[in-house]
């Protein structure tokens, strides 16, 4: 049985003296799907509980022998149980993780880094979401290890409210991000005022 637990040791680069080449990510069992779409810039009807955030996020995957998205999805299915950040912004963190992992990774030693830098519009239902002016600096290390394979994740999300015009993210379930949001049980509902946008319920 596979166990999920917080990393005890840091996920770090292998020694540079080792001559072994970096392994590419293993072929995944899942179908590679297109990245999520962003709704074109437009004026939103709904003004309440809406925030623009300048996002700087990333996920570093540490795995000496490569990795598959099946393992990443397995780890993220337990995200609610292991999340250690501000719970008023857990929905935002899930959105950022999904969007970051839908991009192309950059190799760093034996690690693979997915980054996301973007200004996004988030809307929360009712009185949910962050307080006015609240910011987020979240980082966490998570590992998956079944004695035959080790995969470590370093998740980092910086979110600052800003007045730069952002894009509305939307849920395209036929995308890698959509799969990951489903795995993390992202709670949303469609906005009644703006049919193309989603309201976060967490």
UniProtKB/Swiss-Prot annotation:
Which segments of the protein form a coiled coil according to its record?
none
Q: What is its main location?
A: virion
Give the region (Essential for glycoprotein binding) as residue ranges: 115-151
Extract the GO molecular function terms from the UniProt entry.
structural constituent of virion
Keywords of the record, alphabetical order, are: Apoptosis, Host cytoplasm, Host membrane, Host-virus interaction, Membrane, Viral budding, Viral budding via the host ESCRT complexes, Viral envelope protein, Viral matrix protein, Viral release from host cell, Virion
Q: Where is this site: Involved in the inhibition of stress granules formation and contributes therefore to virulence?
A: 95
GO cellular component entries: host cell cytoplasm; host cell endomembrane system; membrane; viral envelope; virion membrane
Top-level division of the source organism's lineage: Viruses
In this UniProt entry, which cysteines form S-S bonds?
Answer: none
What does the entry give for GO biological process? Answer: viral budding via host ESCRT complex
Give the record's membrane topology. Answer: Peripheral membrane protein
> Where does the record say this protein resides?
Virion membrane; Host endomembrane system; Host cytoplasm
Q: Where is this motif: PPXY motif?
A: 35-38
Query: Other comments?
Result: Most abundant protein in the virion.
Family that this chain belongs to: Belongs to the lyssavirus matrix protein family.
What's the entry's take on its domains? Late-budding domains (L domains) are short sequence motifs essential for viral particle budding. They recruit proteins of the host ESCRT machinery (Endosomal Sorting Complex Required for Transport) or ESCRT-associated proteins. Matrix protein contains one L domain: a PPXY motif which potentially interacts with the WW domain 3 of NEDD4 E3 ubiquitin ligase (Potential).
Record's function text: Plays a major role in assembly, budding and uncoating of virion after membrane fusion. Completely covers the ribonucleoprotein coil and keep it in condensed bullet-shaped form. Inhibits viral transcription and stimulates replication. Plays a major role in early induction of TRAIL-mediated apoptosis in infected neurons. Inhibits the integrated stress response (ISR) in the infected cell by blocking the formation of stress granules.
Q: How does it assemble?
A: Homomultimer. Interacts with nucleoprotein and with the cytoplasmic domain of glycoprotein. Interacts with host ATP6V1A; this interaction plays an important role in virion uncoating after viral entry.
State the name under which the record lists this protein.
Matrix protein
Q: Which organism is it from?
A: Rabies virus (strain Pasteur vaccins / PV) (RABV)
In the UniProt record, what gene is named as encoding this protein?
M
């Amino acid at each position: 049985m596979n166990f999920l637990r917080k990393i005890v040791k840091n996920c770090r680069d292998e020694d540079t003296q080792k001559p072994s080449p970096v392994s590419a990510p293993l072929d995944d069992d899942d179908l590679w799907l297109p990245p999520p779409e962003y709704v074109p810039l437009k004026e939103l009807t709904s003004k309440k509980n809406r925030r623009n955030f300048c996002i700087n996020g990333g996920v570093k995957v540490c795995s000496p022998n490569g990795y598959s998205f099946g393992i990443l999805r397995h780890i993220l299915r337990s995200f609610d149980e292991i999340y250690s950040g501000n719970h008023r912004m857990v929905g935002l963190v899930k959105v950022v993780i999904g969007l970051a992992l839908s991009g192309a990774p950059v190799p760093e030693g034996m690690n693979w880094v997915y980054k996301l830098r973007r200004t996004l519009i988030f809307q929360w239902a009712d009185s949910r979401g962050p307080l006015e002016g609240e910011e987020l600096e979240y980082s966490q290390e998570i590992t998956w290890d079944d004695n035959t394979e080790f995969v470590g994740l370093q998740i980092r999300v910086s979110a600052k409210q800003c007045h730069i015009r952002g894009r509305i993210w939307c849920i395209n379930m036929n995308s890698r991000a959509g799969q990951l949001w489903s795995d993390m049980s992202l709670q949303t509902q469609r906005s009644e005022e703006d049919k193309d946008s989603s309201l976060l319920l967490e």
